[in-house]
A protein has these predicted regions:
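Generic structural signal for well-ordered alpha-helical scaffold segments
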Residues: 63, 114, 232-236
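Glycine-rich, mobile lid/loop segments that gate access to catalytic sites or pores
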Residues: 64-161, 165, 180-185
């Protein structure tokens, strides 16, 4: 996509690639892809799943080209996008009908961008949302065997870019398509949702952005993060008794069974980081989980593949109830090891992985470590820590130029 948009990529500092002459769509696409590529995306789990940070590129693109604002204006716009996407996820499932969650990115990014670029014109925003409904959602087939592929890494960028395109088109006087959501024959709900209602699962405020999940320690689909933690706790015992192994039992919530329990052939790393059995096998064997463990070139690849065949996943109904309980929102997993002499290890249960709102205090220092580790080829530790601290200490009334200068001045 870089050559298509005539960008000269600067991986030391991607923000140096942009000028105010770049289109909103280009900036949004680029940053949304990079957020996923570098694994900085957050997560929100409900009836539908989401990475609300997928909206960052679209919101950033507007303020980067229109920087006479305060930091609080940027933060408020981002909060609105998070709230729209997350509340839709609480209200209506797309995945059960085979559609991908990035459709809600298109709605959230498109509607907030429209509000910004059209200076609060309600009709323009209505046109934007209804044009997005007319587009419809994409299939999520590229996230599942046998069609897993790299599209899952750029699907959100595509959605945010399209949301911006439709918001700009909708700036012009045109039909609003008032009844497209619920019209009986040709409407969105009739044709895409099997007559279910598209709606918010709660009142809109700022709750979603305060309750996202941060991927802190492990490169794994979030429904399996607590299982990886549990497996690491059992790793020493597992390796001491590996010759006695009969099987490994995982007890989990229904969404994990449906999404990431996969003992089939795993064709690539994208398949493997969405296999509960694979990630737990790696964590049991090596007491950790790193990106390279998903690659066929990893020296322990065959060991992991052989072990996952002995891992069995079962739904624990209470975990499913706690997953959907609005006051808990647990992402629980239990693991036990069964040996061939009929003995069983301690069952390790982790209700919420690091990165869950209930463990925020543990997560923030680890997030800083992740940042320092990921930029060590560019900045020394002192410089990286300085960049982190400057961003964390931004004040709401700071001019946005202060924010942008932090990003641009560091080479």
């Amino acid at each position: 996509f870089a050559s298509k948009n005539n960008l000269s990529l600067n991986f030391k500092n991607p923000f140096k690639n942009f000028t105010v002459n770049e289109s909103y769509e280009t900036i949004s696409w680029y940053l949304t892809v990079l957020t996923r590529w570098f694994d900085y995306n957050d997560t929100f789990l409900a009836k539908e799943w989401a990475h609300p940070s997928d909206n960052f590129g679209a919101i950033f693109s507007y303020f980067y080209k229109n920087d006479k604002y305060k930091f609080i204006d940027f933060a408020n716009a981002l909060t609105k996008a998070y709230e729209i996407q997350g509340s839709l996820c609480l209200g209506t499932s797309l995945n059960k009908l085979g559609y991908d969650h990035v459709f809600y990115v298109k709605i959230a990014s498109g509607s907030v961008f429209s509000h910004l670029v059209n200076k609060g014109d309600a009709n323009a925003t209505r046109r934007t949302v209804n044009n997005i409904l007319l587009d419809g959602p994409s299939l999520r087939a590229y996230r599942h065997f046998p069609n897993v592929g790299k599209r899952k890494s750029w699907a959100a960028a595509d959605a945010s870019k399209r949301g911006i395109e439709l918001s700009i088109i909708s700036s012009y006087q045109d039909e609003i398509y008032e009844s497209v959501q619920n019209e009986d024959k040709w409407g969105f709900e009739t044709n895409f949702l099997d007559n279910s209602e598209l709606g918010f699962g709660k009142d809109l405020n700022n709750w979603v952005i305060q309750n996202v999940l941060f991927k802190v320690l492990f490169p794994a689909e979030f429904h399996g993060q607590s299982a990886v933690e549990a497996a690491i706790e059992l790793s020493d015992e597992f390796n001491q008794n590996i010759n006695k192994l009969e099987k490994v039992n995982i007890y989990t919530h229904e969404p994990a069974v449906r999404i990431i329990s996969n003992k089939d052939i795993l064709k690539n790393a994208s398949d493997r980081d969405h296999s509960l059995e694979y990630m737990v096998a790696a964590a049991l064997l090596y007491g950790d989980l790193k990106y390279e463990m998903y690659e066929e070139s990893f020296q322990g690849f065959e060991k992991i593949n052989n072990l996952r065949k002995k891992i069995f996943v079962t739904e624990e109904p209470q975990f499913t109830k706690d997953y959907y309980n609005f006051s808990k929102r647990h992402i629980s997993n239990s693991i036990e090891i069964v040996y061939n002499d009929n003995s069983i290890s301690e069952k390790i249960t982790i209700e919420n992985p690091i990165g869950h709102p209930s463990r925020r205090a543990e997560a923030v220092p680890l997030m800083k470590e992740k940042f320092l580790r990921n930029v060590k080829s560019i900045f020394d530790t002192e410089k990286a820590s300085e960049v982190w601290d400057k961003i964390i200490n931004l004040k709401k009334d700071d001019n946005l130029n202060v924010f942008f200068n932090i990003l641009i001045e560091n080479e």
